[in-house]
Curated annotation (Swiss-Prot):
Heme binds at residue 476. One of its GO terms (biological process) is secondary metabolic process. This is Cytochrome P450 monooxygenase ltmQ. Belongs to the cytochrome P450 family. Pfam families: p450. Its cofactor is heme. Keywords: Glycoprotein, Heme, Iron, Membrane, Metal-binding, Monooxygenase, Oxidoreductase, Transmembrane, Transmembrane helix. It comes from the Eukaryota. Induction: Expression is down-regulated when the stress-activated mitogen-activated protein kinase (sakA) is deleted.
Length: 537
């Protein structure tokens, strides 16, 4: 029997022809995929955007921050948009327009919907997707407010336990990392001048920060012994890493392919393991509910669900809410710790003044107390200036239009559009910050003396010129916990260690990716206990 192809006279195709034809077809599909419509009538910023979006979209995969800076410089009194691989992103610069949209209800302009798209919650964390029914975010906000009230009460043992957990976690992670570095050939690579005999140790900064912040965050969320469980802690830290990574992978594929691609990604498996652990923990707590007082965020959330039976939330809803909180809390806090340590190590001229303030506040309010931390205005200022100088996200106030929205000046935002306001360019704007390109560690400490600016100079303060934690009703409710975590880390390292960048080198360069600016995750610092130095002098 003849094969079907034998009935037709196909020309013989060489390999080069097949490759060229295939590449052409893929290229056409790719360009059509990028040829999404421009729905909003504002200027488009990017290379070659007058003719096609694809070149600017590809460049913005890594360098969107430059496009946002360019748009702000040209159209800072109105708005602009930039192309990405999947959509146009609209940036509202005018302050009056920003105020108009930032507090519009979520049924109209939704923060949760844009986060669902940004981090692909439909596939990676389906229980928190925009379409899913979730425990209200206000519950977590109330829980964090309750914990903050406890921290501010001298009679409540919470903050003392919080500080003790930091100390234990820091010491354990330092020992683990030093042992690993001493046994690794990487610690003895060519060019290193490290001298362990005199107390110096090379420590990778981001892994140290991530584990210590993870330990503190899980203590606040789940208490002991779960925060001290190495397997659980590693899983939490891993989850905070795989969600943004896997989301980037998924967003690069058309929607039809995502159900297949997600099957080979890590985030759903890690999420499933975390959910199983937390459901077991929740059931265990319910069995001993009568004998254990409410002590952490999980207890608070369980109590809220129990008080609202008509809401029909179950243990799985609680577990998924807590998993989402883990994701939201870990990486941004850890990165701020890393940036601050890098700035301190490369700017030793600040150390004496900071240490003098730390000693004075401990003497006045007691070592390790919340009152002492809250009175360290120079420490707070240095961290806030670090945040200003190294802003994680070039954008803020993200919203997805679920309905058409029209500003008072007539600009229409059609349904399905994504809007932001520029964030990082504001920190370079001389209208808001004097000498913005100069790092001034005590900039915000001096601002406290200004009656008009004093309320906005604290690390946790939010306004239109400082949107690291958002602003308005979607401002991050966990920012007070973040402030305490970062301050504990900075104070402990300053007070107890000599430290510098590896090989006495310059500050490790930041790593831009799209709208984000990340610290060098692999960079090491050298640490030496101060008592070891004194012994060797």
């Amino acid at each position: 029997m003849k094969m079907l192809t034998e009935h037709f006279d196909f020309p013989k195709l060489n390999f080069a022809t097949i490759v060229i034809s295939g590449a052409t077809i893929i290229g056409i599909i790719f360009l059509r995929y990028l040829n999404y419509p421009t729905k909003v009538n504002v200027p488009v910023v990017g290379i070659g955007v007058r003719y096609t979006k694809w070149l600017a979209a590809i460049i913005n995969v890594r360098h969107a921050r430059q496009s946002i800076r360019e748009g702000y410089a040209k159209y800072g009194d109105f708005a602009f948009q930039i192309p990405t691989m999947t959509r146009m992103e609209v940036f509202i610069c005018d302050r009056q327009m920003t105020r108009e949209y930032q507090n519009v209800d979520d049924y109209h302009l939704s923060f949760r919907a844009v986060m669902t798209e940004e981090f692909q919650f439909k596939w990676l964390l389906p229980g928190q997707a925009h379409e899913a029914r979730i425990i209200p975010n206000s519950v977590i906000a109330k829980a964090l407010s309750w914990q903050r009230t406890r921290a501010n009460k001298p009679s409540d043992p919470f903050f003392e336990s919080f500080s003790a957990e930091f100390m234990q976690g820091f010491q354990e992670e330092m020992r683990r990392l030093i042992q690993y570095q001493n046994s690794s050939v990487m610690s003895n690579r060519s060019g290193a001048v490290l001298d362990p005999a005199h107390g110096w140790h090379a420590v990778p900064c981001f892994p140290l920060a991530l584990k210590v912040i993870g330990r503190l965050t899980t203590y606040v969320l789940f208490g002991k012994p779960l925060c001290q469980d190495a397997t659980f802690l590693n899983m939490c830290c891993q989850f905070g890493d795989v969600i943004p990574r896997d989301a980037i992978i998924l967003r690069s594929w058309p929607a039809l392919a995502r159900p297949l691609i997600v099957k080979i990604l890590s985030a759903p498996r890690v999420m499933g393991k975390l959910r199983n652990i937390l459901i077991v923990e929740i059931k265990s707590r319910r069995e001993s509910h009568e004998t254990n007082p409410m002590s952490d965020i999980l207890d608070f959330t369980m109590a809220w669900v129990d008080r609202h039976p008509n809401a029909s939330f179950d243990d799985q809803h609680i577990a998924e809410m807590m998993i989402n909180t883990i994701f939201a809390a870990l990486h941004t806090s850890s990165q701020l710790v890393v940036h601050t340590i890098f700035e301190l190590a490369s700017r030793p001229e600040y150390s004496d003044a900071l240490l003098e303030e730390i000693d004075a506040c401990f003497e006045k309010h007691g070592k390790g107390t919340k009152a002492a931390l809250d009175s360290m205005f120079k420490v707070d200022s240095f961290i806030k200036e670090t945040q200003r100088f190294n802003p994680l996200d070039a954008s803020a106030l993200a919203r997805l239009a679920l309905k058409d929205f029209t500003f008072s000046n007539g600009l229409n935002i059609p349904k399905g559009s994504v809007i932001f306001t520029p964030n990082s360019p504001i920190f370079e704007d001389e209208r808001y910050y004097k000498d913005p390109k100069v790092f001034d560690g005590f900039r915000f400490a001096r601002m406290r003396n200004d009656p008009k600016l004093g309320l906005f100079c604290d690390l946790t303060a939010t306004n239109e010129q400082s949107m690291h934690f958002g602003t308005g009703r979607h401002a991050c409710p966990g920012r007070f916990m973040v402030s305490d975590e970062v301050k504990l880390a900075v104070i402990h390292i300053l007070s107890n260690f000599d430290f510098c960048i590896e090989n006495f080198g310059p500050r490790p360069a930041n790593q831009p990716f799209g709208k984000f600016l990340l610290p060098d995750m692999s960079a090491k610092i050298w640490l030496r206990e101060k008592r070891a130095r004194e012994k060797n002098l």
